[in-house]
Design a protein with these regions (language model features):
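Asp-based phosphoryl-transfer active-site loop
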Residues: 3-16, 92
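Conserved beta-strand scaffold positions in the cores of enzyme catalytic domains, especially
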Residues: 62, 78, 155-157, 199, ...
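Short, well-ordered alpha-helical microsegments
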Residues: 46-50, 183-185, 217, 243-244
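Conserved acidic, metal-coordinating active-site core of Asp-based
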Residues: 99-101, 106-234
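Short active-site oxyanion
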Residues: 35-39, 59-60, 172-173, 232-233, ...
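Mg2+-dependent phosphoryl-transfer enzymes with acidic/Ser/Thr/Gly-rich catalytic loops
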Residues: 1-4, 15, 21, 192, ...
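Active-site phosphate-binding/coordination module
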Residues: 22-139
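Hydrophobic packing residues within well-ordered alpha-helices of enzyme cores
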Residues: 24, 49-53, 187, 263, ...
Length: 288
């Protein structure tokens, strides 16, 4: 019997329009009513993970920023975190700047950017919960504003090195965006081979950088240990590279139908795509 289901958000729990469909919502709530814990394990901001978890009444600790932080499901506050080290970030900045790539850093619900631009301008609002069922634009705008305010933007200026040396709080993740394929792959390889970082591809033009050893799997392992849940009692669903270790570790690794081939190959089972309520289908096929 499974005691925990861990769900990635984008490409998994959310459909292509970034919506929790009624079927997915109902299936998750049925699973929770059957006394199976359900959590989110995502690369997104803690506030975004928390907001989506509240939509389906999750009450198990949540995983955000690729496993760098765990989040209280009731309050949205930090439970535990693994931050990037200052000296490691300075090395990272040297490497990134040599290639002329874009980078920004994640605090706990704070996005630190050199300047607000077209790359990052909508980053906070894109983390909101999409609610197409709301009757009026006014209702949607009001909730969008509330949720966007949960994530702060801080412009630090051109000198990221000075900011990192004097940073006011912990930084848990960096996002690197580079449109040139060769430069991007060189950056990924250099940072990964340094042994200082865990790098994961999260899009066609970008990758995320966490401290070495940080992963969704690692965060779930710690949570399971604290709640006396065995690995064999865990199911996990995902679609992308930052889900690989989680799917391989879980007792039941579920790849989405929209996942790339290498993700499907390491999973135990493949469900329908996120456009076809694949999470709901997996819940009813394997967990209920």
């Amino acid at each position: 019997m499974y005691r925990l289901l861990a769900l990635d958000l984008d490409g998994t729990m959310l459909n292509p329009d970034k919506i929790i469909t009624p079927m997915t919502r109902s299936s998750i709530q049925q699973l929770i009513s059957a006394e199976v814990n359900v959590t989110i394990a995502s690369g997104r901001f803690p506030a975004s993970v928390w907001s989506h978890a509240r939509e389906v009444s999750m009450n198990f600790p949540l995983v955000a920023l690729n496993g760098a932080v765990t989040v209280d499901p009731l309050t949205g506050q930090l439970l535990d975190g693994v931050a990037l080290k200052i000296e490691d970030m300075l090395f990272m900045l040297d490497v990134i700047q040599q290639e002329g790539a874009y980078i920004h850093f994640y605090g706990y619900n704070v996005l630190y950017v050199q300047e607000i631009n077209d790359i990052n301008r909508n980053w906070a609002i894109n983390n909101r919960v999409n609610r197409p069922e709301l009757d009026s634009f006014e209702e949607r705008d009001e909730l969008d504003a509330i949720e966007a305010d949960l994530i702060r933007f801080v412009e630090v200026g051109k000198d990221f090195r000075t900011f990192v040396n004097q940073m006011p709080g912990m930084l848990f993740k960096a996002a690197v965006i580079c449109t040139d394929h060769d430069s991007r792959e060189n950056l990924f390889r250099t940072l990964e081979e340094s042994g200082l970082f865990q790098c994961t591809r999260t899009g066609s033009l970008r990758f995320d950088v966490n401290s070495a050893g940080v992963s969704k799997r690692g965060a779930l392992e710690r949570l399971c240990h604290a709640h006396q849940i065995e690995r064999e009692q865990v199911a996990a669903a995902g679609d992308y590279d930052n889900d690989l270790d989680m799917l391989q570790w879980a007792g039941l690794g579920i790849a989405m139908g929209n996942a790339e081939l290498h993700v499907k190959e390491i999973a135990n089972v493949v469900t329908a795509s996120n456009a076809e309520d694949g999470v709901a289908q997996a819940i009813h096929t394997f967990l209920l």
